[in-house]
Amino acid sequence: MDWGLAISSHPKPYSVTTGGNLWRSKHTTKNIYFASSWISKASRHKRETQIEHNVLRFQQPSLDHHYKCIRGGSTYQECNRKFVVKAISKQPLGFEAHASNPKNILDSVKNVLSAFYWFSYPYTMIGITLCAFSSSLLAVEKLSDISLSFLIGVLQGVLPQLFIEIYLCGVNQLYDLEIDKINKPHLPMASGQFSFKTGVIISAAFLALSFGFTWITGSWPLICNLVVIASSWTAYSIDVPLLRWKRYPFVAAMCMISTWALALPISYFHHMQTVVLKRPIGFPRSLGFLVAFMTFYSLGLALSKDIPDVEGDKEHGIDSFAVRLGQKRAFWICVSFFEMAFGVGILAGASCSHFWTKIFTGMGNAVLASILWYQAKSVDLSDKASTGSFYMFIWKLLYAGFFLMALIR
């Protein structure tokens, strides 16, 4: 043993314990015995230093024990002297860390992915993806148009738009940090899951990815789409003179219309028409119906998105439609816009040349309009959870509307 002292029982022993335990000594006479030799009182401090050093080197599979040390030789008294021992066990602690690492890593990955999910507003990303597919299918004239190159063309439009959406979500949360602590405390920036620096890095990275990817494709419809959307929604969020457009209800509504009714469907259609299918530029009737449908629907979205957030918007001077008109009035106006959008869908279906397409799209939009009206009557405007749930519900109706509008010919 490399302590150099005998270990046995003593009526009042020193004890060594783990986790910051103490050596205690109370007015007792103890014998220090080192390798059968007597040590002088003068060398006591030197030997105690060696003992403490050797205790730190002492390794056992379990550290949760008490060890008793006999001191022989010279006698002395110690009054309330305490020695703190930091027990170090390399092998057991290393083994425990190794055993727990996989679980800890998995939990960390899950937490990061969950935070990123809420950071990126997944409901808008689903809407963008379905809008891209719906608009792209309007360019299809015959079944042979749907090929591998067609699917690649759709992805060329979807991926950069998803990247720019993550950038825009990040910018909005960076500038709405204090508002979101009231309106949306579950968001990762407001809750503290992501730091401000992390938000900046994520936003900048996805902005670069979006424009870089689109530039590689060389599609001018997609490049123009990104420029319009990135510039308008950046101006919507950032708090600098003449910008922060979300403070002005009319301008905020124009941002919504320019994105969802104009930039997205028109750019996706012309990307597929001119870049992928190599056909001349055009503006068919089906695209006109989709633009009209999305104009009314995006107006409804512009009004309804701020209804659950009235409290925080009032406190921070955001003059939204819901703040200006009141929740009830703004709510029923937005419901009217949604119903108008489904009315456009019914007219589009009625204009179709194919009988079954006419029936399916016309009846489908009528069913969606009925479901919307039924759901709207059950909303409690005084309950933030109820209004928030309705807002997510109208996005689901939009998803269904995209499928129906893709069939218009």
From Swiss-Prot:
EC number annotated for this UniProt entry: 2.5.1.36
Q: Where in the cell is it found?
A: Plastid, Chloroplast membrane
Keyword Aminoacyl-tRNA synthetase in annotation:
no
Highest rank taxon of the organism: Eukaryota
Q: How does it sit in the membrane?
A: Multi-pass membrane protein
Q: Which cofactor does it need?
A: Mg(2+); Mn(2+); Co(2+)
Which InterPro entries does this chain map to?
AtHST-like, UbiA_prenyltransferase, UbiA_sf
What keyword terms does UniProt attach to this protein?
Answer: Chloroplast, Magnesium, Membrane, Plastid, Transferase, Transit peptide, Transmembrane, Transmembrane helix
Check the record and name the Gene3D superfamilies matching this protein.
Answer: UbiA prenyltransferase
Protein task:
Proposed to be involved in the biosynthesis of pterocarpan phytoalexins, specifically glyceollins. Can act as a prenyltransferase towards glycinol which is the direct precursor of glyceollins.
Stored PANTHER family: HOMOGENTISATE PHYTYLTRANSFERASE 1, CHLOROPLASTIC (PTHR43009:SF6), HOMOGENTISATE SOLANESYLTRANSFERASE, CHLOROPLASTIC (PTHR43009)
Q: What is the official name of this protein in its record?
A: Glycinol 4-dimethylallyltransferase
Naturally occurring in which organism (per UniProt): Glycine max
Q: What gene does this protein come from? A: G4DT
